[in-house]
Curated annotation (Swiss-Prot):
Phylogenetic lineage: Eukaryota, Fungi, Dikarya, Ascomycota, Taphrinomycotina
The organism of origin for this protein: Schizosaccharomyces pombe (strain 972 / ATCC 24843) (Fission yeast)
WD repeat extents: 105-149, 164-204, 207-247, 313-353
Protein name: Uncharacterized WD repeat-containing protein C17D11.08
Residues found modified as Phosphoserine: S266, S388
Low complexity biased stretches: 358-371
The entry's keywords: Cytoplasm, Golgi apparatus, Phosphoprotein, Repeat, WD repeat
Length: 435
């Protein structure tokens, strides 16, 4: 898709061939039949949805007797949904996902979901869930009431009185230092900070020259956040000084000339940056990736202007990157190559080519045999994966990887960091991460 504004929702999804053109392709192509991977009556650690899932978040609070996952749909029709799933572990140690009654219908695709961070001194059994589509919405459910508890909308926040005038919201982040604040990014080039207790916007600013695709608060801060957008830059803002922003990173400026857009733009801009993940253990570190790119850029705000490292391992476009909570060295990525990869920045790379690894079918969610260097793989079908030699300028290779059946659109870490929830096709699956 050469015209970024051709479809206003084509930038709000981030699946398949990236945030920019996936929905445009989805609308213009015949509907593809996606198989039901998890058969009825079999307890796999997975779930078949009647729609294509994208938005995803695993509840990070361990105070509940069960674990919960929220996921949202990406439907072309004005019929979208948020569904809660309960992860149940039996006495034999095997787990399966159970559909809860907590679900709700929405008109527009859900671009992001996040459970509220832990609040100091909070002892309530109710939990807040935030979502974005045309509005920032807050939902509430009572986990102690079990899977029959409904998902109730507590607020729908918008800077416009008329909802149909809203530009789609692409992403948001919950402030972990003060959960009463949420920052939201939009296609209209703005970021808005909301006080969800007062249900009022604290400030709205023009964050980028073009559409904003993702936003994140920095560790331990209620004032500083970073954003990425179609202008190809990572920008940092301080709510105490909004008269300027700091450009932390800008990529290659030849993108638009290669793709036939904005050839007369001055100055030239780089390939759009689609998603951003800020490390919650080191305020200086974050990860991002470009449109139509299989690489992940590692950013250190103490060294602005360039990526301090590039993660190269995917064979297709990257769709998501997430730091492991509580870690400043481990993160997970997924992409159009149907692969989920775990990276450890503290692990040295062996300079010899990674070995060829054959893996036969395994139980969904379980890892296959491991290699000292790279890529144990999980698959329902037998497969062979041949790893290529590392590029000379690549400092890292995946610690391990899983090969799935379709493009992997999103992922989320478990509360104990021992699992990854991933969505692909019409399925959600839990991958067990070796400790």
């Amino acid at each position: 898709m050469t015209d970024l504004r051709r479809n206003r929702y084509s930038i709000s999804a981030g699946v398949g061939k990236s945030v920019l053109d996936s929905l445009g392709k989805f609308y213009g192509s015949p509907k593809r039949q996606l198989p039901n991977k998890f058969e009825a009556g079999k307890e796999y650690t997975g779930y078949n949805a009647p729609w294509i899932p994208f938005a995803l978040d695993w509840l990070k609070q361990g105070k509940y007797s069960s674990e919960w996952i929220a996921m949202g749909s990406l439907n072309e029709e004005p019929n979208n949904m948020i569904q809660l799933l309960k992860l149940i572990t039996g006495d034999d140690g095997n787990s399966h996902l159970e559909k809860a009654q907590a679900a709700t219908d929405l008109e527009y695709p859900v671009t992001k979901l996040l459970w509220n961070p832990s609040s100091v001194g909070s002892n309530t059994d109710s939990q807040l869930l935030a979502s974005t589509d045309q509005q920032l919405r807050l939902w509430k459910t009572d986990f102690e009431a079990g899977i029959d508890s409904p998902l109730l909308c507590q607020a729908s926040l918008s800077t416009h009185v008329k909802t149909h005038n809203n530009a789609p919201l692409t992403s948001f982040d919950w402030c972990k230092t003060d959960p009463s604040y949420i920052v939201v990014s939009s296609l209209d080039t703005t970021c808005t900070v909301w006080d969800i207790v007062a249900q009022q916007s604290k400030t709205q600013l023009i964050a980028h020259d073009k559409e904003v695709y993702d936003v994140a608060f920095l560790k331990d801060s209620i004032n500083v956040f970073v954003s990425v957008g179609a202008d190809g830059s990572v920008r940092m803002f301080d709510l105490r000084s909004l008269d300027h922003s700091t450009i932390i990173y800008e990529g290659d400026s030849t993108f638009w000339k290669r793709n036939g857009d904005y050839t007369n733009a001055s100055p030239p801009v780089s390939a759009p940056l689609l998603r951003l993940s800020a490390c919650d253990s080191d305020v200086n570190l974050m990860a991002t990736f470009h449109h139509n790119s299989s690489d992940v850029q590692m950013i250190d705000i103490r060294v602005p202007g360039t990526a301090y490292a590039t993660l190269r391992g995917h064979k297709g476009d990257v769709n998501a990157v997430k730091w492991m909570p509580g870690s400043k060295s481990k993160l997970a990525t997924c992409g159009d190559d149907c692969v989920v990869s775990l990276w450890d920045l503290d692990q040295p790379v062996n300079p010899s080519p990674a070995p060829t690894l054959s893996v036969s079918g395994t139980t969904p969610g379980m890892t296959g045999s491991t290699s000292e260097y790279v890529t144990p793989v999980s698959s329902v079908n037998s497969m062979r994966e041949t790893a290529s030699p590392l590029n000379a300028d690549n400092q890292y290779s995946p610690l391990l990887s899983w090969k799935l059946e379709h493009e992997v659109n999103n992922l989320s870490w478990s509360v104990k960091n021992d699992g990854l929830a991933v969505v692909y096709g019409k399925s959600l699956e839990i991958l067990k991460v070796p400790q």
